[in-house]
Amino acid sequence: MAGSHPYFNLPDSTHPSPPSTPPSLHWHQRCQPSDATNGLLVALLGGGLPAGFVGPLSRMAYQASNLPSLELVICRCLFHLPIALLLKLRGDPLLGPPDIRGRTCFCALLNVLNIGCAYSAVQVVPTGNAATVRKHSSTVCSAILTLCLESQVLSGYDWCGLLGSILGLIIIVGPGLWTLQEGTTGVYTGLGYVQAFLGGLALSLGLLVYRSLHFPSCLPTVAFLSGLVGLLGSVPGLFVLQSPVLPSDLLSWSCVGAVGILTLVSFTCVGYAVTKAHPALVCAVLHSEVVMALILQYFMLHETVAPSDIMGAGVVLGSIAIITARNLICERTGKVEE
């Protein structure tokens, strides 16, 4: 046919062709969240919210069976050990590459110190306040350390959300610090706040060390080492510092199992998020743990939630909204395949 000959398919030079327009794209193709936004959402939904259950469940296990904090650390670490099977199946070394093995073990040690301080603090301090102090210190330390060590700056909106979250935490924990009782009870409560602060410091250092590790199986290796280091340090300490106690009822066993699963999920999500977004922003989004802990403190533990706690939780949620909205930047797919 004549119409199929290449000669007849040439464009007509006397009539200029209309300007080419890119084909219409679906909404999910035109606008997609950035990596930082994905990381923050993972930290919010998979890191902060599950972690909010850990404090109340730990307190319930302690109240039901007088389960010491070291046993909770041991039970949590046991959930990390099966990750060794995944590393073996992939053919990866259990302790990480030899050249950065020391840094990997140090990161695992910081994670163990973080969870140990957290579990010890919630036994003498209200769960919401303990989570508040820990997240407060982790956010401030992450912002300072990242700025000094990595020279990674934050935008004005990020600083606004960061400072707002810190303000909310001060509103929550401030009245409790001014009303510490004198005597032994006040000393134990003060030590609980100190442990919560040290736990946040260990968390921020652990996140920075984790960001410096670059090998394919980084996350499962650090998770396994956290369990291994935790067991090596907690099992001897349990027999020296405390008397081993077995959970006495089904409620205690359920709380221990839930703590192990939820903390492993939170650990994995935070490890992913910190490779995508600024550590200080990840810690700020993790303040959702505080809000969840306050809710569970009232409904599960039947502990009083002061008006300042509610006000501070509202400020924290508003700050998280600012940070998340700032990072919800739509990336247009400007390239059209020809």
Curated annotation (Swiss-Prot):
GO CC annotations, alphabetized: membrane
Main location: membrane
Domain EamA: 49-174, 272-325
Pfam family, one: EamA
Region (Disordered): 1-29
Keywords: Membrane, Repeat, Transmembrane, Transmembrane helix
Regions that span the bilayer: 37-57, 160-180, 190-210, 221-241, 250-270, 281-301, 305-325
Membrane topology: Multi-pass membrane protein
UniProt superkingdom: Eukaryota
Compartment list: Membrane
Family: Belongs to the SLC35G solute transporter family.
Name the UniProt record assigns to this protein: Solute carrier family 35 member G4
Source species: Homo sapiens
